């Protein structure tokens, strides 16, 4: 769990959209998971908003977010 906290801090610290997209392009995340991360970290949307926007339950978005963090932590 602490790895996810560090990964979240690093994602929040990415200065530009381009750098963020390069990181996501290097990952094996699905397009949906990439969009969840973009909405949450770049546009600062909460999970309820993201779920409503993408047509999923908030809990589903939270689970996908955590799995995505686990998948990309090795890129840092």
Language-model segments: which ranges?
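DNA-recognition helix of helix-turn-helix
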Residues: 17, 54-76
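A short pre-motif secondary-structure segment
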Residues: 36-37
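Short helix-to-turn junction characteristic of helix-turn-helix DNA-binding domains
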Residues: 40-44
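A short hydrophobic/aromatic micro-motif that marks alpha-helical segments and, especially, helix-coil
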Residues: 45-47, 72
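Short alpha-helical "recognition helix" segments of helix-turn-helix
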Residues: 49-51
């Amino acid at each position: 769990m602490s790895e996810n906290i560090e990964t979240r801090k690093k994602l929040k610290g990415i200065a530009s959209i381009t750098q963020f997209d390069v990181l996501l392009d290097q990952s094996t995340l699905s397009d949906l998971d990439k969009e969840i991360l973009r909405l949450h970290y770049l546009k600062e949307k909460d999970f309820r908003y993201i779920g409503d926007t993408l047509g999923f339950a908030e809990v589903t978005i939270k689970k996908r977010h955590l799995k995505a963090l686990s998948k990309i932590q090795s890129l840092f």
